[in-house]
């Protein structure tokens, strides 16, 4: 679902912008600190209700303002949506879809599936399992309508169980939580396993395109020993969990691991190879969504030229062009965009950013 218009008010150094966007490539060029990454961050905020750079909203609101406001128009065929989000220094958030209040962040996220590729995004590969669970759960959120409620209830029950571990004296007092928790854990883990297996060939094929010299393997680990009853594991681990103060085993420990030629990717790949692999994973997942749901996925790419040689940049540009997706790309100079062939398409847009101001 491409964005056709974007209005930004008081988001970091972007005080007042109104942009008409291309459904294809949108290039944002400017020096460091000009505001080009902030533009990507604003789009990301519209689709997630949070930033990919800071979790403190007061750092995102322009220093002279009391709030920021983001508004966008989404076009898909004959359908249009108007979406907006306002964040105040007090912490209050107002969401609107087609002028109506009472919406949730998940409603915005459903309308705007997007993948972000940033220099910090290597945590998907060399960070903890949390980042890889988020990768899987993003796909599941857009793939299965029932996933979000199961996932949210699972998080709620885990939080309640962890709090109860500090209060109960016997397992009998905790068992009511565990009966429901075990059911949800099995459901969520089965969804994750099925999705991971369906995505695996897409990942391997895309990795072969970008990194033909490597054999990339993927594997899903549900967070407890496969083939065992999670309810029994919870019961058997009660004393240990009570001593630690939290649930040590379960779907909250799941992981989606990547290996190159049989070894952990973070141990053997260069930073350039890791970035290519990260790009391949994001592209594979976005393209899988398009194939399964016939929905477009936005791609936000910050610092396109970083750590990629000209040949690899051209490969990435070619693959993105083929996807037919709406793409937002930042770069310091126009020269860095040569591999994106931006000057060859009349349907692309090029924006120059300087001190929070944009010119087209």
UniProtKB/Swiss-Prot annotation:
One of its GO terms (molecular function) is ATP binding. Pfam families: SMC_N (PF02463). ATP binds at residues 30-37. The keyword ATP-binding applies. Keywords: ATP-binding, Cytoplasm, DNA damage, DNA repair, DNA replication, DNA-binding, Nucleotide-binding, SOS response. It is found in: Cytoplasm. SUPFAM superfamilies: P-loop containing nucleoside triphosphate hydrolases. GO terms for cellular component: cytoplasm. InterPro entries: DNA-binding_RecF, DNA-binding_RecF_CS, P-loop_NTPase, RecF/RecN/SMC_N, RecF_2. Its main location: cytoplasm. GO terms for biological process: DNA replication; DNA synthesis involved in DNA repair; double-strand break repair; SOS response. Belongs to the RecF family. The RecF protein is involved in DNA metabolism; it is required for DNA replication and normal SOS inducibility. RecF binds preferentially to single-stranded, linear DNA. It also seems to bind ATP. HAMAP family: RecF (MF_00365). This is DNA replication and repair protein RecF. It comes from Actinobacillus pleuropneumoniae serotype 3 (strain JL03). The gene is recF.
């Amino acid at each position: 679902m491409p964005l056709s218009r974007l209005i930004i008010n008081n988001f970091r150094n972007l005080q007042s912008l109104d942009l008409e966007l291309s459904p294809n490539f949108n290039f944002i060029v400017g020096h460091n600190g000009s505001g080009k990454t902030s533009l990507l961050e604003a789009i990301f905020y519209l689709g997630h209700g949070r930033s990919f750079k800071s979790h403190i909203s007061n750092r995102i609101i322009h220093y002279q303002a009391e709030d920021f406001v983001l508004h966008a128009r989404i076009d898909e065929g004959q359908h249009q949506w108007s979406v907006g989000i306002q964040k105040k220094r007090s912490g209050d958030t107002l969401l609107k879809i087609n002028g109506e209040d009472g919406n949730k962040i998940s409603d915005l996220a459903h309308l705007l599936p997007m993948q972000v590729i940033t220099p910090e995004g290597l945590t998907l590969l060399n960070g903890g399992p949390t980042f890889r669970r988020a990768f899987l759960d993003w796909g599941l959120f857009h793939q299965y309508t029932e996933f979000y409620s199961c996932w949210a209830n699972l998080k709620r029950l885990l939080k309640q169980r962890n709090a109860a571990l500090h209060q109960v004296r016997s397992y009998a007092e905790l068992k009511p939580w565990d009966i429901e928790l075990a059911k949800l854990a099995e459901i969520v883990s089965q969804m994750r396993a099925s999705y991971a297996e369906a995505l695996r060939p897409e990942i391997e094929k895309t990795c072969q395109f970008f990194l033909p010299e490597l054999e990339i393997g993927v594997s899903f680990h549900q967070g407890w020993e496969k083939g065992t009853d999670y309810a029994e594991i919870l019961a058997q681990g009660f004393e240990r969990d009570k001593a630690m103060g939290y649930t040590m085993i379960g779907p909250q420990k799941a992981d989606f691991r990547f290996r190159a030629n049989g070894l952990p990717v973070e141990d053997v790949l260069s930073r350039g190879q890791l970035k290519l692999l990260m790009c391949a994973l994001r592209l594979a997942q976005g393209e899988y969504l398009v194939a399964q749901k016939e929905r477009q996925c936005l791609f936000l790419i910050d610092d396109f030229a970083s750590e990629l040689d000209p040949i690899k940049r051209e490969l990435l540009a070619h693959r993105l062009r083929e996807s037919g997706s709406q793409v937002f790309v930042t770069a310091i100079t126009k020269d860095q965009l040569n591999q994106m062939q931006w000057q060859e398409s009349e349907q692309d847009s090029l924006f120059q950013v300087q001190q929070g101001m944009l010119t087209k």
